Amino acid sequence: YKQCHKKGGHCFPKEVLICIPPSSDFGKMDCRWKRKCCKKRS
């Protein structure tokens, strides 16, 4: 997974499915933190 962040209600990059875990687990990007996942646009 690539890193992403939310800004202005949009996720960047918004064309891929990615997530950001809590900083304490920054090495693990397995998308179990659903609320921080950026979903691919339909």
From Swiss-Prot:
At the top level, the lineage of the source is Eukaryota
| Tissue-specificity statement | Expressed by the venom gland.
Gene3D superfamilies, A to Z: Anthopleurin-A
One Pfam family in the UniProt entry? Myotoxins
Subcellular location field:
Secreted
GO terms assigned for molecular function: potassium channel regulator activity; toxin activity
This protein's UniProt keywords: Antimicrobial, Disulfide bond, Ion channel impairing toxin, Myotoxin, Neurotoxin, Potassium channel impairing toxin, Secreted, Toxin, Voltage-gated potassium channel impairing toxin
What is any one GO biological process for this UniProt entry? venom-mediated myocyte killing in another organism
Q: What PROSITE patterns is this protein classified in?
A: MYOTOXINS_2
State the SUPFAM superfamilies in the record.
Defensin-like
Question: What InterPro entries does this protein's entry cite?
Answer: Myo_ane_neurotoxin_sf, Myotoxin
Question: Which Cys residues form disulphide pairs?
Answer: C4-C37, C11-C31, C19-C38
Could you name the Gene Ontology cellular component terms for this entry? extracellular region
- Subunit info? Monomer.
Family named by the database record: Belongs to the crotamine-myotoxin family.
| Function description | Cationic peptide that possesses multiple functions. It acts as a cell-penetrating peptide (CPP), and as a potent voltage-gated potassium channel (Kv) inhibitor. It exhibits antimicrobial activities, and hind limb paralysis. It also induces potent blockade of neuromuscular transmission in young chicken biventer cervicis preparation and potent myotoxic effect. In mice, it induces myonecrosis, upon intramuscular or subcutaneous injections.
Provide the protein name: Crotamine-IV-3
